[in-house]
Amino acid sequence: MSAAVVATLPTLLLLLGLAAADCPSSSWVQFQSNCYIFLQTTVKIENIEDVRNQCTDSASGADMISIHNEEENAFILETFKKRWKAQDDILLGMFYDTDDESFKWYDKSNMTFNKWKNSEESQDLIDTCGFLQPKSGIWKKGNCEVSSVEGALCKAAVSYEKKYLPDHHILITALVIASTTILTITGAVVWFLYKRNLTSGLTNTAYTTAPQLPYNDDCILVDAEENEYVA
């Protein structure tokens, strides 16, 4: 039975590992199906791509922040209050597309939500970036040509396995696979022992000595002589 348990450990550890691997590392914070991190280092930049590189280099599939609803914006604001520290406005992962005159997210997700200040007036938006005010959660427009930023706010989607296979499903799957493997290996061991004992029994039977006659050669000779004398 111990061999069966050992045999299931790699599968069990792999599945439980998936359950623990919500985000790229413990430095990231998960909200719904995404992970977030604020890389709090002052970065001298020439353009927004330098900030974006901080995110794309931090984890596979990561990019600058995109925000799609009030709940996500509130989560970002709350996390800045409790965990992240920032005084300056934070660059959002958006750019102004002059072809269709609209803002777009760098991660190519749809622009379905905004939190612009009510006082924002239409203006020449070429080289305009979006900024998040970490204390209010309000967005504002500003020139992309900034010499430095306080940090990079990054976002990465939770892996497919975690997004579509929740923790309790992973645990149940792990237990089912482990139990099935243990039963299979145990059954194989029992069958092997049964076959070995059966083969051993047949071998012993084949080598059993033949039954001896009730008389040995000397007795037969004496009986023959007595019969001859009587005759």
UniProtKB/Swiss-Prot annotation:
Signal sequence annotation: 1-21
Any GO molecular function: carbohydrate binding
SMART domains: CLECT (SM00034)
Transmembrane segments: 170-190
GO terms under cellular component: cell cortex; filopodium; membrane; microvillus
Keywords noted in UniProt: Cell projection, Cytoplasm, Disulfide bond, Glycoprotein, Lectin, Membrane, Receptor, Signal, Transmembrane, Transmembrane helix
SUPFAM superfamilies: C-type lectin-like (SSF56436)
Entry-linked Gene3D superfamilies: Mannose-Binding Protein A, subunit A
Location of the protein in the cell: Membrane; Cell projection, Filopodium; Cytoplasm, Cell cortex; Cell projection, Microvillus
SS bonds (residue pairs): 129-144
Cytoplasmic side: 191-231
Side of membrane Extracellular, spans: 22-169
Function according to Swiss-Prot or TrEMBL: Potential multifunctional C-type lectin receptor that may play roles in endocytosis and phagocytosis as well as in cell adhesion and migration.
Name of this chain's protein: CD302 antigen
The gene coding this protein: CD302
